[in-house]
Amino acid sequence: KHGEYKLVRLTKRIDDRLLPKVKIVDMRMELATRKKIAIFSTVLLDAIENTLKKGKQAIIFLNRRGFSTFISCKSCGLVLKCKRCDTVLVYHFEEKKLICHYCGYTQEPPEICPKCKSGYIKYLGLGTERVESEISRQFAQAHISRMDSDTTTKAGSHDSILGKFKSGETSILVGTQMIAKGLDFPEVTLVGVVSADVTLNIPDFRSSERTFNLLTQVAGRAGRGEHAGEVIVQTY
């Protein structure tokens, strides 16, 4: 009303480049077909394989770091939480520790349940560390990098990871929201979103808006060069 702000609409990409095609994969149907819980759908695995065969690059996005997002006793149901702030502890494979992402508290993972003394401890949930591990297993010949706040703590590590990806030394980049914005790599023709539901479950009344914004941003990393892009979004 006061003319202080103007609405600017971006109706197309620069140089009239095509927007990437977006495909939604219902992982519940995947579970029903394959009879097991899988990190990647057959659609995403096939897309990654085709991308690598063409000599192009892929970005795999999951906005959750760590290996297992919680560990639980299958006997009594106990979920291990931070002793300081009661936040669920996340297991990090490289450090071999449980870490609180809120206050930084760490502890060794228990061999038996501290409550019922059962040895039936399960590592559950999914983070970028596990995604990287699984992709390395599925595509052993591919060069893979992971970019999150765990891999970018050292000086120069951020530029090193992006430099290798830009040069083509790395063919698959796994990461959190750090890779969702501002990256322009013309050879990236595929973006895979492992679990689009992660940010929807955050206790914030704007979680749906933030999820849409994040998905829109990461989808924009695909097809920024001469070749058309594809985005595969896995959801439950």
Q: PLM features: residue spans?
A:
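Inter-lobe coupling/hinge segments of SF2-like helicase ATPases
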Residues: K1-Y236
